[in-house]
C-alpha cells in the first residue's frame, strides 16, 4: 500500500487525511494518507524515508515550507521563485522534487470567481506560510499594487522580495480594490 503524509507542527487540526483518504477510497486507489507532527531536526530523516521509498510523497505545511528546501534535490520553477514548498515527491530520476501547488490553487480559485485582478489594488492581511505564493500569483495576474498588513514588521518586510516592487508601505483601505 502506498503511503502519503502531510507534515507540520502543529498538525492535529489538519483535515487533509480525511479528504485524501475519502477520494483514494472512492477511486479504489491502494494508498493511505496520514498526518505526522515533526520537529526541524526530523526533516532530514523524513526526506530519507521518501528517498528510500518508504513514503511515496508528502504535503508540507507550517512551519516547514521553507525549512524543508535544503533537503531536496530539485525545485519546480514556482517553488524556486517563492522559496516555498508544499508538495514533495520522488521524480522519475529518483530525485526528491519540491513543488509549490499553492500558486496554482490560488490562481484556479480566482479564475473560478471570474474576477479580473488586472490593475487592481489588493490588500493582504497576514503574512502566513502561503502568502509568498499568493503574492507571486497576484503579480502574475498583473495587479497594480499589493498592500500587506502583518503583526510582525520583519516578516512583512521579508515578503517584499516577492512583490516586484508593487508592494506599498502605506495605503488607504478606501483605495483598495480587493481585500
Residue positions per predicted region:
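Short acidic low-complexity segments
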Residues: 164-178
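Conserved acidic residues
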Residues: 56, 144, 176-179
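Short, aromatic/basic amphipathic alpha-helical patches
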Residues: 158-164
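Nucleotide donor/acceptor-binding cores
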Residues: 2, 119-120, 177
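Conserved Rossmann-like nucleotide-cofactor binding loop
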Residues: 154
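Glycine-rich adenosine-cofactor-binding loop
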Residues: 8, 100, 110-143, 147-150
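Phosphate/diphosphate ligand-binding glycine-rich loop within oxidoreductases
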Residues: 2-113
Amino acid at each position: 500500500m502506498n503511503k502519503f503524509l502531510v507534515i507540520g507542527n502543529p498538525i492535529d487540526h489538519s483535515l487533509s487525511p480525511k479528504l485524501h483518504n475519502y477520494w483514494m477510497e472512492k477511486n479504489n486507489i491502494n494508498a493511505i494518507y496520514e498526518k505526522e507532527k515533526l520537529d526541524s531536526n526530523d526533516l532530514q530523516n523524513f526526506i530519507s524515508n521518501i528517498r528510500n521509498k518508504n513514503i511515496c510523497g508528502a504535503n508540507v505545511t507550517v512551519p516547514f515550507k521553507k525549512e524543508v528546501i535544503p533537503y531536496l534535490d530539485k525545485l519546480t520553477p514556482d517553488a524556486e521563485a517563492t522559496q516555498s514548498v508544499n508538495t514533495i515527491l520522488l521524480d522519475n530520476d529518483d530525485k526528491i522534487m519540491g513543488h509549490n501547488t499553492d500558486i496554482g490553487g490560488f490562481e484556479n480559485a480566482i479564475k473560478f470567481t471570474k474576477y479580473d485582478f488586472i490593475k487592481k489594488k489588493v490588500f493582504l492581511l497576514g503574512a502566513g506560510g502561503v502568502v509568498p505564493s499568493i503574492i507571486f500569483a497576484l503579480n502574475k495576474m498583473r495587479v497594480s499594487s499589493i498592500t500587506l498588513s502583518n503583526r510582525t514588521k520583519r516578516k512583512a518586510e521579508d515578503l517584499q522580495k516577492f512583490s516586484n516592487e508593487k508592494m506599498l508601505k502605506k495605503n488607504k483601505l478606501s483605495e483598495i480594490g480587493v481585500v
